[in-house]
Amino acid sequence: MAKKITFVLFLGVLFVFNASAYMVSFFIIESGLPPEGTKNQYSQLWENAFFDVFFDAGYIVCNSPMMRLDSKPKMSLENFIQDEVDEARDGGADYFLVAQIDFSRDSLRPSEVSIVLFKVTPFRLIKEKKITGKTYKSEKDEIDDLRNIVKGIVPKINEF
């Protein structure tokens, strides 16, 4: 009987200590699209890729509402996102990931995507990556490529 109780206690302690996960907050910024337009499908694909990959890797995920701008922000990204980072920190986020999706005026496809990963406390840049827009044969190819790009970011969190 003592062995059973010891075994149950061991399993309980094992699961209690492994029950935590990092929380990652996402923020999508669209620039170069008219403010009155509808949600862009490519922005939605990026957001879905972030959620899918990070959730599948065991992270708690949340997001801020997408923001649409006429052009890239004039101030530094760190200053521009400060309110969103503060809100994420207050919500318990450990990491904050920004995807700035830049569109050219004559296309609804992204011309460039900047992905920037920050540690929230203390606030510091971990990884920055720029991706040039591409044309894909199918939506499945595009989704697979986006997920692979995002999968390359996940190990950076594990380094900290």
Language model regions located:
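C-terminal partner/receptor-binding element of secreted or periplasmic proteins
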Residues: T132-F160
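A short, hydrophobic beta-strand-centered structural micro-motif
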Residues: S25-I29, E78-L108, E112
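Positively charged n-region of N-terminal signal peptides that target proteins for export
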Residues: M1-I5
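N-terminal segment of the mature soluble domain
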Residues: E36-G91
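Boundary at the C-terminal end of the N-terminal hydrophobic targeting segment
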Residues: A19-M23
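Amphipathic beta-strand/beta-sheet edge segments enriched in Tyr/Trp
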Residues: Y95-K140
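Bacterial N-terminal signal peptides
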Residues: V8-V16
